[in-house]
Amino acid sequence: MLASSCVSTNYLPSRIYLLSPPKTQDHLLIFLPGRRSGIHAFESHGTLDILRSSGIQADCVSVDATLSYYTDRVLVDRLETDVFKKAEITGYKNYWFIGNSLGALGAIFYAQTHPGKIKGIILLGPYLGEGPVPDEIQKSGGLLKWEPNMDPGKDSIQDAWVFLRNCITDSTGNFPTIVFLAGQDDRYHQIHSLVAEALPADRVFWAPSRHDWVAWKAAFSEFLHSETAKKLFSKQTLQQPK
């Protein structure tokens, strides 16, 4: 169970990183940190440098989405008010989440409630829940064969997995593209494999190490320098179906 902390959730702080200031790019990456990270994690671990050296034409905003935003159930509203409304005024065309650990669930929660708004979600060492839902998926023979046993809205983790499956199987362009990055020895590897096995191979990037920034940096770098990233972030993909 997630424990709350005494932090005000009336506003969601963020920090913007422009690729070529004062000009803004067409793509905006929104970094949602993990439970033990924070607003500076994307920069302090060198991930921002990897983005800038990759040639990908995108700006980035890192948000201070601490655990309290989840336990208070205000993350989605705060993202909309404090991040996306400002970004829309700026004129960004495509929005991508980088959901790190718990931030992966945050990205999914937002995308679920804002259909068609998010172009893609990069799952970076994602935390996707534990317990009965992943167990059921595994026993069913994988995500694409699984049938949820609860009605929608009864369990947020089940709803998140249903949404992931819809993203993966979608052919209309109405759901976000999913890219998966993680460590080969992550403690959630068994759960991660349920996602990775359902995705096209060119959208899955494993790296040595565990649930840590050693793995995440390596996998992020491999992805950004791949043909997959070049296609996803090219001018031709702007506002086009997947």
Write out the residue ranges for each language-model feature.
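Short, surface-exposed "cap/lid" segments of acyl-processing enzymes
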Residues: T9-S53
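The feature captures the conserved acid-bearing segment of alpha/beta-hydrolase catalytic domains
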Residues: I16-P21, L143-P200
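C-terminal catalytic histidine-bearing segment of alpha/beta-hydrolase fold enzymes
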Residues: R35, T71-R73, D185-K242
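Conserved alpha/beta-hydrolase
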Residues: L51-Y69
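Alpha/beta-hydrolase active-site loop
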Residues: Y70-T90, F109
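Gly/Ala-rich beta-loop-alpha elbow adjacent to hydrolase catalytic centers
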Residues: I98-A107
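Hydrolase active-site cap/lid region
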Residues: F109-G153, W206, W216-A218
